[in-house]
């Protein structure tokens, strides 16, 4: 599948399915997130980590691949800005974003690897679960595009997903065990479990050919090697996958306590869990001048 075809499939998915509301404020794409009460506080605190790396105020915040800005925490990123510029390949995403942001948003249909903005115009840049849709070569280009439009003395924050998380690989036996137990319990209770979507990176529509073919793995080594000129820092956004949360974390098993402990460990060792966990928070600072 060509790069153009990949982008077309992504656009069609989000226009026709992913960003269609199924209830108030809830989108089809929500099935790629764990929205259960047991995980709610952990997910909430992970979302807020982005704020630590953005300038608290400015004129324009670029949200590259904004989607509909679907979670309340996402709105906090631009609270101190005059405008949030939402750039997305999906027109449906931008329609939904307008419902949330109104006049405080500006909306542009755009490819994040080829941004239609002049250099150094944004006081902050954020991109959440977007770059993994691109082939690896274009991911590198997209990082440089985000850097190009960022003002000097400011930082950009990108939440992405590794194609192969060492931590999740080590814990895969536990996930399989808990999924087996869960199916057995569901059968005993006389109900079927919903099939789980196996996701190696982040919230993404699947295709017969993995995005960018991934002859090279998207991991910390790739990032440092390909973006050495930008000097990226790797922090933790969230170390465990949606599949892990759904399989292992349950209220009756003390799920909230386990997630509290996990969050504390992530805070204590943010770079380790950023490199080894599922979802890194990649921060790049642009010097002045």
Provide a role label for each language-model segment.
Residues 1-55, 70-74, 157-187:
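Conserved class I S-adenosyl-L-methionine
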Residues 62, 67-114:
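Class I SAM-dependent methyltransferase SAM/SAH-binding core
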Residues 126:
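A conserved beta-strand element that flanks and buttresses the S-adenosyl-L-methionine
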Residues 129-130:
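Short catalytic micro-motifs in class I SAM-dependent methyltransferases
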Residues 140-152:
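A short glycine-rich, Lys/Arg-flanked "PGG" loop and its adjoining helix->strand segment in the class I
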Residues 202-205, 221, 225, 232-289:
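A C-terminal cap/extension of S-adenosyl-L-methionine-dependent methyltransferases
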Residues 205-221:
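Acceptor-substrate binding/catalytic loop of class I
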């Amino acid at each position: 599948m060509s790069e153009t075809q990949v982008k077309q499939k992504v656009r069609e998915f989000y226009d026709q399915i992913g960003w269609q509301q199924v209830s108030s404020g809830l989108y089809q794409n929500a099935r790629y997130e764990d929205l259960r009460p047991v995980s709610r506080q952990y997910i909430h605190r992970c979302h807020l980590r982005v704020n630590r790396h953005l300038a608290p105020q400015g004129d324009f915040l670029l949200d590259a691949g904004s989607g509909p800005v679907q979670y309340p925490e996402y709105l906090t990123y631009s609270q101190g800005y005059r405008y949030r510029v939402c750039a997305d390949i999906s027109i449906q995403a931008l329609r939904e974003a307008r419902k949330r942001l109104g006049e405080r948003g500006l909306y542009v249909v755009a490819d994040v690897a080829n941004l239609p903005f002049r250099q150094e115009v944004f006081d902050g840049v954020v991109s959440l679960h977007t770059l993994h849709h691109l082939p690896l070569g274009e991911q590198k280009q997209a990082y440089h595009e985000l850097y190009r439009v960022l003002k000097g003395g400011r930082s950009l924050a990108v939440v992405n997903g590794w194609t192969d998380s060492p931590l999740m690989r080590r814990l895969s036996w536990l996930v399989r065990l808990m999924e087996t137990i869960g199916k057995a319990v569901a059968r005993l209770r006389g109900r079927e479990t919903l099939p789980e979507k196996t996701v190696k990176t982040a919230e993404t529509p699947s295709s017969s050919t993995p995005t960018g073919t991934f002859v090279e793995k998207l991991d910390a080594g790739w990032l440092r090697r390909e973006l050495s000129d930008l000097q990226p820092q790797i922090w933790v956004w969230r170390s465990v996958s949606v599949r892990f949360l759904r399989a292992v974390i349950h209220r009756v098993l003390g799920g909230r306590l386990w997630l509290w402990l996990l969050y504390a460990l992530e805070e204590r060792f943010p770079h380790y869990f950023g490199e080894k966990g599922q979802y890194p928070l990649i921060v790049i600072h642009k010097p002045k001048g």
